Amino acid sequence: SRVFADVDAYLHKGKATIWGNAYYVNGRTHNVCYNETTDFEQLYPYLMADSVGGKTSQEYYYFMGGFSYPLGKKWTIGAEGEYTARMEYRTRDPRPKNLTGDLCAKVGVSYLLSGLHSIGAAVTARKYKQTNELKLYNEVSVPTIYHLTGLGNDYYRFRGVNTSTYYKGYGVGGMLTYSQKDQKGWFAQAEYEYTNIDKIISTLNELPMATLESTRFHVTVGYLMNDGHQYYGANLDGDIYRKFGTENIF
């Protein structure tokens, strides 16, 4: 169940084009089991887990803004920034309180070839952090907390009551694009991203338990048509995504 609000903006100011987007989501996720960490898909397998789980509440904030500016008749420069914040919690044991911050910036340039063909390139940088804390107030029964390492395994030495962790990391990437100025005909995009995120157990003197490295390569090829009233098109997408994990030995 979710409630959300969404606002978009797009305008021309002189030669510049400015755009932005902001939205807010408030919702709940039911029947969560063996995961007490936010951003599951990004941080798997290095999650904090227990066998109880339950329903979690969440709030999600997103802000994005960018601009582009022509330099003569051939060149155009642009930049875009976005920030995502998320809070996830539960009001009964076990009680996670997760706060995430994800900041991303992108800078790019495009060049108009002969005719209507345009090529572009961009670089991206990213900063990520999550505090992942779990509280247990039941004095009669306390579940075992696991620090998962994938394939049904966990780091046995840290199993128990180490319930305060955080994740921090960075990402870098690049993008190449091809399109036509009138937004008709063929278009293509190739994108690469590398991320490096550390999992740190706060309750063990900031112990660096593991490092997760991931690479993603994405390609899109498509074709657009315009009959004067609306656009029609089709595209083909492909993704190659790999993760590499390193668990430190203590």
Question: Model-predicted segments: where are they?
Answer:
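Surface-exposed extracellular loop regions of Gram-negative outer-membrane beta-barrel proteins
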Residues: 68-92, 102-106, 187-202, 235-239
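Long, internal scaffold/assembly segments composed of regular secondary structure
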Residues: 159-250
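Outer-membrane beta-barrel translocator domains and adjoining extracellular loop/strand segments
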Residues: 1, 31-37, 89-96, 132-138, ...
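Residues that define the transmembrane beta-barrel architecture of outer-membrane proteins
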Residues: 1-5, 57-63, 97-103, 168-174, ...
